[in-house]
């Protein structure tokens, strides 16, 4: 009986130490082989969650462990959750202070009205201040009021003086007015400085200085259209004068006057001394932009020019003798 009782504990111990045919789990016995059965691994997961007796490093040793995501999660706590950007931002905050203040200061400066650029004033909005001469003669080419209006910009502090027109009820823009050829002639002569002393029929014209300021103004523009229907347009400030006829009657006189100074188109086709026609193969002799057929004609022209130059020299010499 004692032998049989002694054998039962050995049988129970042998049964407890036997292996499960469905799993490789060993109870109470250390096995050095790696655990590859997924059922056994699932049991180990439960044991790890309940008893905390198996560490994560034990599961890493198994090449087929389904708990690799747990290892990655533990590694992400130290590596992936702490991004380089966050670490760099923390380092900059420790060294240089918070960088958000710099960006906010830039945004605040952009939103500030004082940092805006000054207003741009275009040409039509700007006028030239009237001179004292035009104040004395208000009935010149165009009526101009004596007072000026000051426009002040509150932010930029720039002040412009703008001349007011007497007709304030007229719409803004260019106001076209057509005149006859005589009126256009009479009024446009004022704008020519070379004709100021010759013309005296214009009202208010007393001296050349009275209209010199108008000729120098930047608001005046003259447009001359040539062709079968010549037309001259005078733009003075915001006023337009249109003349449908060529009012410059002295154009032909000017051509005759300056014809001797400027050479004609066919100045190489004729001799300037004997009026001989010059062909394409003939020799041409030049002197002061004049063509000659021979050296004799050119020398004769040169002698005539020398005589013309000697006469004023002789007169000057005689006048000097009288003085001394």
UniProtKB/Swiss-Prot annotation:
FLZ-type Zn finger ranges: 266-309
InterPro entries tied to this protein: FLZ10/11, Zf-FLZ_dom
Pfam family, one: zf-FLZ
GO function terms (MF aspect): zinc ion binding
Induction: Up-regulated in response to mild as well as prolonged energy depletion. Induced by NaCl.
Keyword terms of this UniProt record: Cytoplasm, Metal-binding, Nucleus, Zinc, Zinc-finger
Listed GO CC annotations: cytoplasm; nucleus
Signal peptide limits: none
Transmembrane stretches, start-end: none
Localization, UniProt: Cytoplasm; Nucleus
Top-level taxonomic group: Eukaryota
Example GO BP: response to salt
Role this protein plays: May act as an adapter to facilitate the interaction of SnRK1 complex with effector proteins, conferring tissue- and stimulus-type specific differences in the SnRK1 regulation pathway.
Subunit structure: Interacts with KIN10 and KIN11 via its FLZ-type zinc finger domain. Forms heterodimer with FLZ2 in vitro.
Family the UniProt entry places it in: Belongs to the FLZ family.
Name by which UniProt lists this protein: FCS-Like Zinc finger 11
Organism of provenance: Arabidopsis thaliana
Gene encoding the protein: FLZ11
